[in-house]
């Protein structure tokens, strides 16, 4: 949201030494970085609660997190196959971080980190690098053969197309998430300014749906990209 609590502004100023809350308010980057730290703290706290006194018969937070992770593991297995299960921790971390980041923006006084292009670009570039590192590790130098095309005389045509397609992946991942989350924030802000009591409620409910959909899309595309790098290079 665009009107943080006074306490949150004070905390931001304390975290970024040498800056006042007013100065930080002029730079949305610092606000999103601070909320990113908050999301990480929430995930660490949930993880500690889930693993504290963990038992064979799960209960409470352990039961909830096991249900969430089992669902994510099923999606990873269905999309990437058994060979892709080694990347389950990466995909699960992405999914949990994105979901909490998207949902936190629905709380008045908080801004979703995913409404910043910097956050989304960092995640998208990370997926891009992992994809090609996996490809090289699995297939060696043969991984780059699929950039050249099936026959050598098609290389001048296929190579630029493949390069543009791969370079567009982090761009599309980051811009899609940024556009949806930032756009929803703007719409919600407008509704709050017009009718601050009841009218924003449907938009907030839609925001929950958008948060889950955007998390799923980012996670699914990441799995598809990495699974493509795992396949036999042709």
Swiss-Prot record:
Pfam families hit by this protein: ATP-synt_A (PF00119)
Annotated signal sequence range: none
GO cellular component, one term: plasma membrane
InterPro entries from the UniProt entry: ATP_syn_F0_a_bact/chloroplast (IPR045082), ATP_synth_F0_asu (IPR000568), ATP_synth_F0_asu_AS (IPR023011), F0_ATP_A_sf (IPR035908)
Spans through the membrane: 29-49, 90-110, 116-136, 147-167, 186-206, 207-227
Sample GO molecular function, one term: proton-transporting ATP synthase activity, rotational mechanism
GO terms, biological process: proton motive force-driven plasma membrane ATP synthesis
Gene3D superfamilies attached to this UniProt entry: ATP synthase, F0 complex, subunit A
Family membership: Belongs to the ATPase A chain family.
Assembly: F-type ATPases have 2 components, CF(1) - the catalytic core - and CF(0) - the membrane proton channel. CF(1) has five subunits: alpha(3), beta(3), gamma(1), delta(1), epsilon(1). CF(0) has three main subunits: a(1), b(2) and c(9-12). The alpha and beta chains form an alternating ring which encloses part of the gamma chain. CF(1) is attached to CF(0) by a central stalk formed by the gamma and epsilon chains, while a peripheral stalk is formed by the delta and b chains.
Name used for this protein in its record: ATP synthase subunit a 2
Origin species: Syntrophotalea carbinolica (strain DSM 2380 / NBRC 103641 / GraBd1)
